[in-house]
Amino acid sequence: MKIYSKLAALAISAFVMVSCAQAQQTETRKPGHFTKVHSGGSWEVILTEGNTEEIRIEAKGVDLDKVKTEIDGDVLKLGLVNGNYRNVSLKFYVTYTDLEGLRCSGSGEMHVESDVIAEDFYIGLSGSGDVYMKNLRADELDASISGSAKIKIQSGSVGEAEISQSGSGDFVAEDLSIEELEVSKSGSGDTFVGDLGEISVRSSGSGDVVYSGSPRMGDIKVSGSSSIRKR
């Protein structure tokens, strides 16, 4: 009977440990000041503007002490401590006071739910992750996509924009007006933008550039089956 009792106790303890590991854990952190956010992994990041910098973490399948929220210069880095992880569900709710750039590597998603106003804004994607923005107003935009990642901007206006694409990733911003646009692309990724003042394109592969308005045509060099056309 004692053996059975010990086995039962061990089974209960193991069940409790597994249940705790699978339960959702929540923590709020004050990381310090940052203006850019880098997410590297398969999780979701939701960003909103506020009066103070703050991160709320929702984690399932991983201990919170394995979740990294580090400041490197003016960059907030989100991720996990090096290790082997399975069945991890992780979500970051980031509150910022000033936002100047986003970087996403891996298969995660970043959602900016507030309007963003900036002098210079940078978006860099590699892998299959996506960035979604509600509204962007900036003097200059530098956007880089590699792999199958996608950038989607619902609306806004930009003075000068440089968009670099390699692979099958798309840049989708049909209601984003741009005074001067320069596109450099290879592969099958498409570029959709709004009203343009001037456009320059260097494209190889099958990716298209689709725009609105009647822009001045700058330096246009196209090879492959790519097309540049008005919507």
What do these predicted regions represent?
Residues M1-R231:
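Intrinsically disordered, low-complexity terminal regions
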